[in-house]
Amino acid sequence: MNKLNLVFVAISTVFAGNTIQAGGLLTNTNQHVAFNRMMSREASIGIDGVYYNPAGVVFMNEGHHLAINWQLAYQTRSIKNDYALFPNNVNNPITPRTFKGEAFAPVIPSFQYAYNKGRWSFQGNFALTGGGGKCNFDDGLGSFEKIVSETAVGACQLAGIVDQAAGQIGLPAVFTSNNVFGTQGKYSYDSYMHGRQYYFGLSAAVAYKVTDNLAVSAGVRGVYATCNYYGYVENITVGNMPLYKVLDPTKENSANIELSCDQSGKGFTPIIGIDYKTGKWNFAAKYEFKTRLRLKNKSVNKTPSIGNLADNLRASYIAGGVPEAAADMVLSNQNVQGAMGALKNHFDKNLTEAIGEYEDGKKIAGDIPAYLAVGVGYKPIDEVRVNVGFHWFDDKHATSYNDRQKLLDRGTVEYNAGVEVDVTKKITLSTGWQNTNYGLSDEYMDDKSFVVSSNSVAVGGVYHINKKMDLNVAYFHTFYKHKKTSETVQLTPTQSLSYNSDYTRNNNVFAVGLDINF
């Protein structure tokens, strides 16, 4: 039972990572369909450059340029866990167990605009810079069940201490009987959670053509974050005893844990860029500074208390016909008092720590890391364009709650390459690849919020409707690697359990966009 409060932590942090993303830990880089079909756009000159290569946009023709993009994304997350206490779940006594979450974002819009005049380009961009959907875990997570399973063991241990004290004065064992907690740590519970994250980004930039070959840009992005987290763990039963009966038997929901938290915050990202083109080559770079972001909580959370545990155990004794004096003698036993006192102290301390991050009115650190993008483009002939790119995200210096970023080995590194070919005057086909490598340590991995390194492959094309309009279509799939970890849990001073976890994801994105020149 001293572990019960930690379920609250699990609920409250399950959706700390991005829902739908291509990029770093908190950065979406799939902001135009051209990326979805080619993967490498850092050195391309086009309307998508408003995000990928803002300095290069100034080399487009004079006039107005507009891009309208729509994406649909579906992602699954799965964690296989072989924790040894899971067979005690009377409703699902299987190990290893796979816990699965699903995220579906049917509409992810983005818009880019540029007006070029002379040596100047004035640009704007609206997109989801982070998040982008809702993720559901219909049956909870392994960390949830792990804590409930340990709660069941703790309840049985306390029951044993109480019954041992009762036996010393001739009373029969009550709480370790199979009609109450039993001795095996059997349990059941219901759990659900969902989370939603949207980081809206609106940027403005200016690019200037220094020479016919060199351009620079400067801009700023405003970010507004809005998040919602809801989850619960309820109907916890240990053996045949509903847990609420020893916490507050007058309220069936007294053992339930519920999180309902809305978060919002805003920040600003300065952005600079440079582009240099010579002959068949183009070189470009962009740097986004760190975004300081503080999320303010608006929460209505419900958590259990075990402050009345002794009184409720006493009431159970008396209701079973035990004289008040005998019940008082059992519960005043030094071992029983010590066990309940330690239980309450651990519970209250950990519950305070758990509530801290999602306390109503509190502001939580959630910085978006600095981001460097470098690209090279080469055009061997007019009909063929080849791009390669590199990304670096400074994740270790983007402050998050409890300085979790310090557990990373390094920031995220990405490499990409893409090619597009004009097969006819009306049709362009393209494909691309991107490798994403996170600086993950074993300590950083957590089924409540995780990423794993991956390779993404894209295909798509452009239909040139006329000289003013181009239709982009794309699909990309992300092949995630598996991250395996091992952990040892100390249940008691003399008992420990080791278990393994296997983390992975699956991601599919479809996209359609229209580029307009006028």
Predicted regions and their residues:
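Detector for outer-membrane/organellar transmembrane beta-barrel domains
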Residues: 273-295, 332-348, 352-439
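Transmembrane beta-barrel strands of outer-membrane/channel proteins
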Residues: 68-74, 124-128, 218-222, 285-289, ...
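N-terminal, post-signal peptide beta-strand-biased segments of exported outer-membrane/organellar beta-barrel
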Residues: 17-137, 143, 149-150, 156, ...
